[in-house]
Design a protein with these regions (language model features):
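Alpha-helical transmembrane segments of multi-pass membrane proteins predominantly involved
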Residues: 1-195
C-alpha cells in the first residue's frame, strides 16, 4: 500500500515542481517531449507486466505502474484541463490501488499454501463475496463506467484536443485500458473460475 501512496506523491511533486522551479519554455520542453514519452512507455510497460505477472502482489504493482503512466501523460500535456483531469484520476487511482492491495492481503491469507501465486488453488471461504469484491475493484481499476476511473480517463482524453500527439495519446490510453481488462480477467479467472 505504501507503493501506491509514494508513487502518487511523486506525481504530485512533479506537478508542483513544474510551476515553481522551471520557467515556461523549459517546462514545456521537458514536459511535452520527455515526460510524455516516459508516461506512454510506463503505461505500456505496466500493463504488459500485469499480463505476465505470476503473483497477485506483483500484478497489483504493475497495475499501479500503469496508472502512474496515465498520470504522467496527463501532466505532460501541459494544460490546465489535463492537470485537472490528472488530479481527479490521481485520487481515484490511489484509493482503488490501496483497496486492491488490501484485497490482495485478504486473498493471500485465504489461499493457504498457495498464498498470492496465480495458480489454480482450492476454493476459498466466502468465495462469492471475494469474487464480487474482485469484480468491483477490477471494474474500478480498469476505468469502466459507472465508476470514477472512467470519468478520469474521459477527462484526460478530452484534454488531448490541445496537444500535437493527440492520436498517439488516445490510442495508447485505449489500448492500455483494453489490455488492463484482459489482465484483470485472466487473474479473476485463475482466482475464482478455475478454483
Amino acid at each position: 500500500a505504501i507503493f501506491t501512496i509514494m508513487t502518487k506523491v511523486g506525481i504530485y511533486a512533479i506537478l508542483r515542481v513544474n510551476g515553481t522551479v522551471f520557467d515556461d519554455a523549459m517546462a514545456q520542453s521537458i514536459f511535452k517531449n520527455t515526460l510524455l514519452l516516459i508516461g506512454l512507455i510506463t503505461s505500456i510497460y505496466g500493463v504488459i507486466g500485469a499480463i505476465g505477472a505470476e503473483r497477485l502482489r506483483r500484478f497489483v504493482g504493475f497495475m499501479v505502474l500503469s496508472s502512474v503512466g496515465t498520470l504522467l501523460i496527463a501532466i505532460a500535456m501541459f494544460n490546465t484541463q489535463a492537470w485537472s483531469a490528472g488530479l481527479y484520476y490521481l485520487v481515484h487511482s490511489t484509493l482503488i490501488a490501496a483497496a486492491f492491495y488490501l484485497f490482495c492481503g485478504w486473498i493471500t491469507a485465504q489461499r493457504g499454501m498457495f498464498k498470492d501465486h496465480l495458480k489454480v488453488a482450492p476454493k476459498i471461504k466466502n468465495e462469492k463475496a471475494a469474487a464480487l469484491t474482485y469484480f468491483l475493484i477490477a471494474m474500478m481499476i480498469a476505468g469502466l463506467p459507472p465508476f470514477s476511473g472512467f470519468l478520469g480517463k474521459v477527462f484526460i482524453l478530452q484534454a488531448t484536443a490541445e496537444t500535437a500527439y493527440q492520436g498517439w495519446i488516445i490510442a495508447i490510453i485505449l489500448i492500455v485500458s483494453l489490455l488492463s481488462i484482459l489482465a484483470l480477467t485472466r487473474v479473476g479467472f485463475i482466482l475464482f473460475w478455475r478454483a
